[in-house]
Amino acid sequence: MKWNRIPLFAIALTFCALTGNAQTKTQLQREAQQVAAAVLAGPSMEKLEELCDRFGARLTGTAAYDHAAEWGAAQFRAAGIQDVKLEAITVPNGWQRGWAESYLYSPVSAQRKLHLESVSWTLSTPRGGVKGEVVVVSDISEAALRANASAIRDRIVLFDTEHVFADGFNKVYPKLIASYSIFKALGAQGLVLPDAVPNNVLGDWLDIDNGKGEILPLPIAEIGMEDALLIRRLLTKGPVVIGFSYENQISGPVSSSSVIAEIHGNDKPDEWIVVGAHLDSWDLATGAQDDGTGAIMVLEAARAIASLPHPPRRSIRFALWTGEEPGLLGSRAYVQAHAKELDHCVAVVNTDNGAGKPRGWIVEGREDMKAALEDLVPIYLKGYAADQVSLETTFDTDQGPFMLHGIPAFDLWVDDVAYNAVHHKSSDTVDKVDPAYFKTDGAIVAVLAYVIAQGEQPIGPHLSHAAVAEILKKAQLDGYLIAHGDWQP
């Protein structure tokens, strides 16, 4: 079928019931309860342990990720789903982290080791590393950098992140991307970004590249929070000299695959929804909260729905995405490859906020979807504490590429305290996951996916390009997405 794309202002805020009569609604309630029960009684934690402990870090383009993808495909098949495939994408550059070391040389009495790692998808330092005086930069506009050219040349640049990103990361992002070539042209030896998490625990800075898996043009490193504060204190007393070196492995284009498993609908098989989470993780972590929990929720939703005596009305495509961390590479490629089918995509349900106390759903700025869920949740998710709906527009994970095409998008919303504590850190391990919250979150995802797929009517229309643009502008995401290459006004 073809969707009539309508402008945002014309959307009625009333929810067209997903079921046509009381008997059908009662049957759907019963089936939703069966789906939830299957997830709650299922082996979520055991699967998460196998994914994270057996395969470890799952960086896009590495053998560890490929093995995890094959495992994910086998899990879908074991659930009785026959239509399972690996959809390959090409990442422009393969990248793997090597060793790194860094020292503070002056003005301390003896050189002191610093906590530092390369950021991802950056080239290695020159042989022997880089060493020089530190200069703090708080304004990365081209005019400010060129005005301070003499202070930047031959120096190691430490970002004053509080001021650099004072206007918000999304607004500053275009300047950030443009600044790399300017720093290189001005002769900076390298850039150092302070981490924001205590105890010198290192993670990996997000989105500092162009989101396409391309190699950054100069050495860029992340330094522990306390080490950065030490350098800033010492700079108030005089010059500070540090050095760092690291070696990364960089190859040419590499292939990496998303895992797609489809349960074909029995009434409207050409209409489909996506239930997805990313399978890849940063290499510094085993990716339990980010996003092993989400990947297992998708696997368990597939298993639970496949266990019902009949398939849903619409088809459901379960997706374990590759390449989310370096830039939504898998989901973006899927949307491009299946562009001619997108008119038939009813909704996308995504989970990439870890396993925490459930709150509800983020609906990417859509008032009509907020109204839909407020009508639906009390019927089918009563008792799951998932009754809140956020109008926040994020575009920070794999529902984003679908949302840009006006497709209704639902991102699981949970309390993110536990998630944020370990996000992209080496401490993002299985023991940080609360099993009860994990299973409850998984049941919520599975039930919403099934109810949307089983409804007599689509949960909502596709938005027009202009309506999506209105949402992005309101969220102040338009400039970021234009610079990122994801959006054309």
Model regions and ranges:
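Extracellular/luminal Protease-associated
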Residues: 62, 114-219, 286, 388
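Metal-dependent peptidase/peptidase-like ectodomains
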Residues: 220, 228, 268, 321-421, ...
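Second-shell loop/turn segments in exported
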Residues: 32-40, 53-63, 132-137, 146, ...
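Noncatalytic luminal/extracellular "stalk/propeptide" segments of secretory-pathway proteins
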Residues: 24-33, 37, 49, 53-156, ...
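Catalytic-core environment of secreted peptidases
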Residues: 26-30, 41-65, 75-79, 83, ...
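His/Asp/Glu-rich mid-to-C-terminal helical/loop segments that flank catalytic regions of hydrolases
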Residues: 303, 307, 420-489
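Bacterial N-terminal signal peptides
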Residues: 7-17
